[in-house]
Amino acid sequence: PSGHFCLTYVQKRKIPEKFFDNLYFTTNYEKFIKKLIPDCDKELVPDARLVIPFYDHYNELIAVTGRSLESGSKVLRYVTVRTNDSKDKLLFGMDTVDLNQPVRIVEGQLDSLFLNNCIASGDGNLSIAAKNVDCKEKILIYDNEKRNKEILKMMHNSIELGYKVVIWPDYIEAKDINEMVMSGISPDAIEEIISNNTFSGLEAQTRFTFWKRV
């Protein structure tokens, strides 16, 4: 309903309204998961969360992520639970992606909602996610965190593996797609930035070297 704090949260993050029907809310994530998956043995939190469902190519529910609506260093921001016993890499957005077109791969589920034909890894292991996507062209879009050693290591590895990687221009200060949108950059403008800053091979290595030093 209008004014609800979860609705206020997604509106504040400027999530496109067309996705509102695909997102859910629970006042108690632990109870929600126990009802959905009675034999779940994962440690859960009994707090209010935005619920983000994962579906496969066949529109079968394969997992859910609970995104905390609170902030703070002690808050576990994301809690993801599978609905099956699969060991495959979890990917968000596989129910809507067109594998005949270039596929963008980002870290965050909410970030993926702002880009065309985009899926999310749910973590920084984008090259592992890419291995699990059967399409001709994949573009890896890491968070804009040049001070994060883990991100740098994974970006370097992806470039070495030959993937196309986005090297964010220096004037971009936001750390991820959602923050860029919240700072006033339109999704269309972000699409253009991505298009103009996607590199592979030697050019990616060169630009990556300069980017991480700035």
Predicted regions mapped to residue ranges:
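Phosphate-handling DNA/RNA-contact segment within nucleic-acid enzymes
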Residues: 31-137, 150-152
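TOPRIM fold recognition
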Residues: 74, 100-103, 109-214
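Short, exposed beta-strand "edge-strand" segments with a Pro/Gly-rich flavor and a Y/T-containing core
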Residues: 9-14, 82-95, 168-175, 179-183
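TOPRIM metal-binding catalytic domain and adjacent DNA-binding surface shared by DnaG-type primases
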Residues: 1-51, 55-58, 97-98, 159, ...
